[in-house]
Amino acid sequence: MKLSRISAINWNKISDDKDLEVWNRLTSNFWLPEKVPLSNDIPAWQTLTVVEQQLTMRVFTGLTLLDTLQNVIGAPSLMPDALTPHEEAVLSNISFMEAVHARSYSSIFSTLCQTKDVDAAYAWSEENAPLQRKAQIIQQHYRGDDPLKKKIASVFLESFLFYSGFWLPMYFSSRGKLTNTADLIRLIIRDEAVHGYYIGYKYQKNMEKISLGQREELKSFAFDLLLELYDNELQYTDELYAETPWADDVKAFLCYNANKALMNLGYEPLFPAEMAEVNPAILAALSPNADENHDFFSGSGSSYVMGKAVETEDEDWNF
């Protein structure tokens, strides 16, 4: 029987320095939800209205659905088309962290919410047409045979579709509510920013190898897909935030992040500045230096609890 040759990855021979740069960023950013003291948010959770609590749970089940899609189908679907073995390794890290993100929302639920309410939110996520529709649109391209269209879909998921949900914890954080939960969401946002940047970078590297006509065709596809997703996201936002006055602010946030997604692909913004004008309080809450005392880049800080070993002497225990 003839055996297929398997090549061992060699991190000492790298053809694209970006692979090592992003690998190092992702591994240095590694975190787990168990280290964030979510229980400190219980008093704030109890001050939210029933509508706000239900909205929060629905937002987080929607985000969990997208993380599950990216973990199980999205990142793995990109691996066969990787340009380097190191790119495959980075994509495997991305896939794993999407599973961590999905796990994180369950940590929030188990800490703050009643099981029956969480079950109702999960049932809602399976029945909500716009939420299921956006997952189906993205999944359709992941299961297709065009590697560049897969990357476009992945960047739009990472850099755009999450943000109708991310808006809510940033809003609460800007008002001093659920601040530890917001810290956890910032860790997720930090990861997604790197994921979207890296996959967009790889898209642009692949674009260098194709004809001008193919590039124009893919650009047209990207803008058409974004508009399809945007129209669906408007409907999702209207349904999700129906009992609040916040839908218009969320839609501005969508335009802002849609433009960022296009920039990750190397394209010009689609939405004019007046449509993408985000409330400064939301942008401040997104900042690495937001008031939750979180070191955004190292993953350390007062809200991310890591045990430290300190050597002691016998006399230290004489109280």
From Swiss-Prot:
What is the organism of origin for this protein? Escherichia coli (strain K12)
User: According to the record, how does the cofactor bind?
Assistant: Binds 2 iron ions per subunit.
Reaction(s) catalysed by this chain's protein: a 2'-deoxyribonucleoside 5'-diphosphate + [thioredoxin]-disulfide + H2O = a ribonucleoside 5'-diphosphate + [thioredoxin]-dithiol
Kindly give the CDD domains that the UniProt entry links to this protein: RNRR2
SUPFAM superfamilies with a match to the protein in the record: Ferritin-like
- Give the residues the record marks as binding Fe cation 2: E98, E158, E192, H195
A GO molecular function term, named singly, is: manganese ion binding
UniProtKB keywords: Deoxyribonucleotide synthesis, Iron, Metal-binding, Oxidoreductase
Q: List the catalytic residues.
A: Y105
Q: Which InterPro entries match?
A: Ferritin-like_SF, RNR-like, RNR_NrdF-like, RNR_small, RNR_small_AS, RNR_small_fam
Q: What is its EC number?
A: 1.17.4.1
Which positions bind Fe cation 1? D67, E98, H101
**Group of enzyme by EC:** oxidoreductase
Q: Which cofactor does it need?
A: Fe cation
Please report the name of this protein according to its UniProt entry. Answer: Ribonucleoside-diphosphate reductase 2 subunit beta
Recorded family membership: Belongs to the ribonucleoside diphosphate reductase small chain family.
Q: Does the keyword Iron apply?
A: yes
> What is one GO biological process annotated to this record?
2'-deoxyribonucleotide biosynthetic process
The keyword Metal-binding appears for this protein? yes
The protein's matches in PROSITE patterns, at most eight in alphabetical order, are given as: RIBORED_SMALL (PS00368)
